[in-house]
């Protein structure tokens, strides 16, 4: 899979959700709420430059950070994971980090 293919899959999933919520009428309209890519490489720097279309190879480390920004609801949602690409898929390096709203709110209240 390439980084471009990964981003296209993400756009389809986010568009479907936005259509179900009545935010957009067709997939092509997702750019109103999703204005960046889903991923970039990590390793050399904090935010490595990723060239679209580069095949994801075992040993690569990338982010998984789809984000939706819904101005009319005054909300932005973007939760990141870091992934190690393996021969058979990926290993979620950030699996132990809290992500559920209740967990985040409890942590912030400390």
Regions found by a protein language model. Name each.
Residues 1-110:
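Active-site neighborhoods and metal-handling regions in enzymes and metal-associated proteins
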